[in-house]
C-alpha cells in the first residue's frame, strides 16, 4: 500500500516518473535543458537489459489533461505489475519524453484499412494495450511479463505503406472510368454519324451517278486526243500576248484565225486629222507604206492624247474584218527603241502565228 501511494503521489507531480530511492546512484548534476551524458557509468541505459517504450501514453495524457488523471489512475494501476523495475532516467530526459509523447498522442494518428480504400480511422489512446518484453534477462527463463506494445512498434505499424493492391485497384477504377467515358463518347459520335449519313445519302447517290456517267466515256480516246493536242501545241506562258504585226499581216492573221480573239500591236504613221464621232469616239487614219488602216478610239475611261500628224504612233487593239476598222484601246507616240525592235518582233510573231494556224487546221 505504501508503494502504490508513493507511486500515485509521484504521478500527480507534474507528470514525472516514479523513481525508487533505493535504486538511485550518484551522478553528475546537470541543468534541466541539457541531456544526460552518454559516457556516464553511473547511469543505466534501457537498451542494456530492456526493450521498453519511452513512456506509456497515459502519463502524457495526464500532463496534458490533469482533470482526467485520477480516473485513468484507477484503471491503469492494476495493469502494470509491481515486479517490473524501470530503469533510472534523469528528470530532464523524462520531461522531454513526456512532451514528445504528448505530441504523438495529440497528433491524431491515421491509417488506411487494408480492405477499404476510402475509410480513414483516427488512432485512439484507448485502442491499444501496453506491452513490455524483457530481452536479455527473462528470455532464457521462459518467463514473460504482461504484453506491452512499445511506442516504436506502434510507429512502425502505423507507418506501414499501402499494399500494392490498393494502387492497382485505383488504376483499375481509373481505367474503368476512362473506358466508360470512351464508350459514351463513341455512342454519341455514332448517333451524330448516323444523322450525318442520313443527310448525306442523296449527295452520295448523286456522286455515284456522276461517276457512272464518267465511266461510260472511253478514257483511251480522250487521253490520246488531249496528249496529242498538248504535244502539238504547248503554250509557253499563260499571260496575255500582243501580236506585233504590220497592217498587211494583221489582216491576214485575222482572216485565218476568225474564231480566236487576237490583240494586235501596229506601228504606223498618223495620216489624217483626229475627228470626233458618235458615242465619244475619235476617228483617224494610219498608214504603213501603201496600206492604210482606219482607226477608232472610244473615250470612255480616258481621253485620247494629243496626236501629231506625220509621226509614228503605237496603236494596240482588235481588228474588225467586217467593218474594216481597227478598234484601238491604246494610242500613243512610239519611242525610238520601239521603232528599232519592231521588225524583230514582227518576225517572231509571224512564226508563232503560222505554227498556231497549222495546229488549229489539223485538229
Curated annotation (Swiss-Prot):
Tissue expr: Highly expressed in adult testis.
InterPro entries assigned to the protein according to its UniProt record, in alphabetical order: Spata22 (IPR033536)
Residue span of region Disordered: 1-51, 98-127, 140-170
Intracellular or extracellular location(s): Chromosome
One example of a Gene Ontology biological process annotation: spermatocyte division
Chief place of localization: nucleus
Keyword Protein biosynthesis carried by entry: no
Cellular component aspect of the GO annotation: chromosome
Feature: compositional bias, Polar residues: 1-12, 30-48, 98-108, 140-157
Membrane-crossing segments per the record: none
Keywords from the named record: Chromosome, Disease variant, Meiosis, Premature ovarian failure
Functional description taken from the UniProt entry: Meiosis-specific protein required for homologous recombination in meiosis I.
Disease implicated: Spermatogenic failure 96: An autosomal recessive, male infertility disorder characterized by non-obstructive azoospermia due to spermatogenesis arrest at the zygotene stage. Premature ovarian failure 25: A form of premature ovarian failure, an ovarian disorder defined as the cessation of ovarian function under the age of 40 years. It is characterized by oligomenorrhea or amenorrhea, in the presence of elevated levels of serum gonadotropins and low estradiol. POF25 inheritance is autosomal recessive.
The protein's assembly and partners: Component of a multiprotein complex with MEIOB and RPA2. Interacts with MEIOB. Interacts with the complex BRME1:HSF2BP:BRCA2.
Name assigned to this protein: Spermatogenesis-associated protein 22
